[in-house]
Regions:
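Short, small-residue-biased leader/transition segments that mark boundaries at the very start
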Residues: 1-2
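Acidic, low-complexity, intrinsically disordered peripheral segments
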Residues: 7-8
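Gly/Ser/Thr/Pro-enriched helix-cap/hinge segments flanking short amphipathic alpha-helices
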Residues: 11-170
Length: 170
């Protein structure tokens, strides 16, 4: 097969490529692949990636689709003192603006859909709380179709909530 012999055609193309891991510093990225563990020392025919909290612990895990092979699951086992809140927005929520406050500091993100090539990531959003066990408030500004904003005060962390436009956190 051509794709398995690509190395004989090109000196720089590879069928199996190494996984890469970067740390976001806000404005630049540092290559931290060497800190990623044994999975990052091998080559894979990786062609898709999905991110999701597979065990509902608030830490995102990664599933990598390998062309013609078994998927690779990178289970996030990092333990730290930080807290989180998970939101499962129901209905047509792509584009919703989620804002929250922790200790008087405002944070925000846009709810996205989709994922990577032939992959779809977990639709739930994880809101970071740092050392605080709860959010001062959470606000969801729904996309134009719903045309509303929902706000919730003093939301406890460490769990997932479901929310539809105009409803209570469940």
């Amino acid at each position: 097969m051509l794709f398995r012999s690509i190395e004989t055609i090109s000196s720089w193309l590879r069928y199996k490529e190494p996984l890469l891991l970067f740390h976001n510093n806000g404005r630049t990225f540092d290559d931290v692949t060497t800190l990623g563990g044994p999975a990052f020392t091998l080559g894979y025919p990786a062609r898709g990636l999905a991110v999701g909290d597979l065990d509902n612990d608030g830490r995102p895990d990664v599933v990598i689709a390998n062309n013609g092979g078994a998927p690779l699951v990178l289970h996030n086992t990092l333990h730290n003192a930080n807290h989180w809140i998970g939101l499962n927005l129901l209905g047509n929520a792509v584009g919703a603006n989620i804002t929250w406050s922790v200790g008087g500091v405002k944070h925000g993100l846009f709810h996205r859909g989709g994922g990577s090539y032939l992959s779809s990531s977990d639709p739930r959003d994880i809101l970071g709380l740092g050392p605080s066990a709860s959010a001062d408030w959470i606000q969801v500004q729904w996309p134009a179709g719903a045309g509303r904003t929902d706000r919730f005060e003093h939301v406890a962390g460490g769990r997932y909530y479901s929310l539809a436009p105009g409803s209570k956190l469940k």
